[in-house]
Regions:
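Short, exposed beta-strand/loop patches in secreted or surface proteins that constitute
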Residues: 180-185, 207-208, 257-264, 284, ...
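N-terminal leader/targeting segments and the immediate start of mature chains
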Residues: 108-159
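N-terminal mature ectodomain segment of secretory-pathway/periplasmic proteins
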Residues: 141-223
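Short, hydrophobic/aromatic-rich segments at coil-to-beta transitions
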Residues: 154-161, 185-193, 215, 263-272, ...
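Gly/Pro-enriched, hydrophobic low-complexity segments
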Residues: 270-356
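Short, solvent-exposed aromatic-acidic interface loops
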Residues: 195-201, 219-225, 297-301, 335-340
Length: 362
């Protein structure tokens, strides 16, 4: 809104130059040529506002031109317009952050590069058949039929968009988040990019899982790295997350030979997923309709700072099943740590979009 307001204020210089209105706030004379520059500056700021609303990543380039032109006009009319420098300075900060975010070293561009090098034209995937799922427990077979996986192409990858909320720690306030992720299943990989802000300061994060190695990075203002977690606890935890995503968002991938199944009762199965030398176990709970309604694992580790890790039970209760181009998935989930002090629900996710078997980056 500051950008829009600043843009509209520049119309005053244009109006005074062409005598469209009496501007008592502007005591210095403004030529018609200068008035045209005030108009151009106004248009630039309004364009920046619209580009930002439309989530066009190049908005900051137009903003640089607008700020430079605006500040030159302010200097020429310093006595009347000097306070515009404050607004230009306020707009400059997010421009700098956006510029840093456009550098190859930004988490957003690392995420994009990692995904792009794994996307390629793929052969036509065969449809999932009843024969493919006959080795699965009856409950899992019912789940795959319920989700519409049978008769559709097997899943090699997917792209997912979330909106939701997260907490840093127990008792903290919820933060609004937006995220995007790509998962790959021919060669296991998961890339999860998240954006949010705290006290008005933007930050972003990247979970990267390739092979069986995981890292988590968080940067403030795309510049200051505050978390860089890695190690065996991260590797184990993100193996759980990769399998959780498979169960929730890519049921067709549950025919994977690296999963061992055990029917516990009519609505519960135990699954052990192995990726090279890492094995994790989870309990999957279903309802009578065939929906997966909870995923519970004891193999995930909690950390507030990416340095100290604690092993707690982790669960993701699920609901809100909806159809996406013939595939039905849960669109609402929570992530809960079961700590000695009690349950800590630290994330709530709403699925906004999901696509399967992509060949190009979106």
């Amino acid at each position: 809104m500051i950008v829009l307001l600043h843009g509209l204020i520049h119309l005053m210089g244009f109006a005074k130059a062409f005598h469209f209105a009496e501007m008592s706030q502007l005591t210095q004379p403004i030529s018609k040529m200068s008035g045209i520059l005030w108009l151009i500056t106004s248009i630039l700021f309004i364009t920046v506002f619209l580009l930002f609303l439309l989530k066009q990543n190049y908005w900051w380039i137009i903003a640089v031109a607008a700020i430079l032109l605006s500040q030159s006009l302010i200097v020429q009319n310093w006595r009347d317009a000097k306070f515009g420098t404050i607004l230009n300075s306020a707009i400059l900060l997010p421009v700098i952050i956006a510029f840093i975010g456009a550098l190859p070293s930004s988490l957003a561009n690392i995420y994009k590069a990692e995904v792009q090098k794994r996307l390629a034209p793929m052969y036509t995937l065969p449809d999932l058949t009843e024969t493919d799922i006959k080795h699965l427990p009856d409950t899992v077979q019912k789940y795959l039929r319920y989700t519409g996986a049978i008769g559709k192409p097997k899943v090699n990858n997917f792209r997912l968009e979330f909106r939701g909320e997260m907490k840093q720690k127990m008792g903290a306030k919820w933060m609004n988040i937006s995220s995007e992720q790509y998962n790959f299943y021919d060669d296991y990989a998961r890339f999860f990019y998240i954006k949010s802000s705290l006290y008005g300061i933007p930050f972003d994060g990247l979970h990267k899982y390739v092979g069986n190695k995981a890292t988590m990075q968080i940067k403030v203002a795309s510049l200051f790295e505050v978390v860089h977690a890695k190690g065996k606890e991260m590797d184990l935890s993100d193996t759980v997350t990769l399998f959780n995503d498979m169960c929730v968002f890519a049921p067709a991938a549950l025919i994977d030979k690296n999963i061992q199944w055990e029917q516990v009762d009519p609505l519960t199965v135990k699954a052990t997923f192995t990726n090279t030398d890492i094995s994790i176990t989870a309990m999957l709970t279903f309802n009578e309709k065939g929906e997966l309604i909870n995923f519970i694992s004891d193999d995930r580790y909690y950390s507030e700072n990416g340095e100290k890790f604690m092993n707690y039970k982790w669960s993701t209760p699920l609901s809100g099943y909806k159809d996406f181009n013939g595939r039905k998935i849960s669109t609402y989930g929570e992530a809960i740590w079961h700590t000695p002090e009690g349950e800590f629900a630290y994330a709530r996710f709403d699925v906004k979009e999901i696509e399967y078997n992509l060949e190009d980056y979106k």
